[in-house]
Amino acid sequence: MNKNNIILTATSLALAIGVLSAGAKSFKRGVSENAFNLKEEIDVIKTGTSWFYTWGNVPNNNIKDLPDADFEFVPMCWNANYNADNIRSYCKSHPETKYLLGFNEPNFKNQANMTPEAAAAAWPAVQALAKELGLKLVGPAVNYSPDGPENDPYTWYAKFVNLVGKDAFDYIAIHNYSGGVDGMRTMIDKFYGLYGKQIWLTEFCNWPGNNTVTPEAQITSMVAQVEYLEKSEKVYRYAWFKAKGSITTSPAYGLIVPKNGVGERELSEQGKVYVNMSDFDQTRYHSMTEVVPAVEYVNSNTLVLGSSFDGKNPSPIEITKFNSGAYADYQFDVPAAGSYTLTLRVSGMGEPTRFDPTVGIYSVDNDGKELSTLADNRQFQLPNDNQSYFDVQFAVSLAAGKQRIRVKDGGPYSPSGIHISCLTFNPNGSVSDMTIDTEKVACHFAGECLQFTGNAAIGTASVYDLNGRLVASGEVEGNALAAEGLADGVYVVKAVTAEGAATTLKVVK
């Protein structure tokens, strides 16, 4: 776990004057929720989602006037006993309505519970209603069933389509709770291949049977699945299951923090990630003057997202885990060939509790193939605090034009506790050497204080024992940090200057 110094600077000029960048809201992304009753619930969800449904013909009365073109409600004929007049009335008052969802899990006994034959017999009336209202029609939503009239979703659909024909609906709806991209992709690929219809994934989250799912596991699978769903041309729309529910106990899918009564609502950690993830627009290229949130990548591998505490980050979320082999690809439009400085805003936990991160910068093509190394792998230190941010700079030479740039983990070890909040470019390629090393600063215990010596003016310091426990921290005054009551032994000291440069020192008491 040897460490090589890298440049850690104060907030760069690019962050001070750069244009803030935030991605557009995804047309695809939606939520399912049968218990929306408050405007405040809608307000926190609609910031990053475009549609919702409740499994009902119309929204609940308390929110029936809230849907609009920016956050549309999609009515559903849950089974054959729907109220066509209610749907007509809603569509008349909400001309933004464009779609009608068909039967919900007809191959489940405790859902619509319809044989393919029964569903086919009731389908012409649903078709007629959709045609009358000028709505695109989404076929019945199916999944694997433990008890239905036809357990296998492919068999149920084959029999249904054999009776009504492929032209009886515009899209196919499915549900998937596998928790992984592979199982989801397999199901989507198969249905799309069979019928050539784009997919509405109207229920999904990580809920594989009776397995325990932690909030962290739910977010990890969400991040990978949303990226796949946004980028797949086979997927027309998707909806998370569901907006309200437990956020701490399995399956921990809730997007809104549970709260009784009226009043403002807030997103759970799961909700912050789902609502604020990128729309993965492959046609959008950032300018070199933007402050780009780290979550605005267009391609990634084995990373996790979570809340950001960086005031310089335009997004409320950031990369919170960069696993071994992880990477994130970003699109930039470079105005002129030349030397540039790439600045990453980072925080997180490093040694002695985690391996310090190693990061390299690469040029990649649109298929993700690495074309060239822009900056070699370097290991750098972290502040051992997820809410203290520093600038890490890389000097790179770029060609002019639109291109993809990859930020990639290069370390042989996992885990690294790095967080990445945002990134910027400066068009000069200069990197100011503000690294602290042991030639510039040293420290030793002097009674109940930790005394600093050297050329660097230390502003704050944190002291850890060899188990990684924080035992002292605070401002350094008169080159000394109060460190009372510490037993004799070896300690690790993280020292930071007022400009944001940092180093880790080992000291014996």
What are these regions (language model features)?
Residues 94-116, 137-147, 167-176, 201-204, ...:
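Active-site groove signature of glycoside hydrolases
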Residues 426-449, 454-455, 459:
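Residue-level detector of functionally pivotal "anchor" positions at catalytic/ligand-binding pockets or at interdomain
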Residues 54, 75, 104, 154-209, ...:
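Aromatic- and acid-rich polysaccharide-binding/catalytic face
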Residues 281-429, 468:
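Extracytoplasmic
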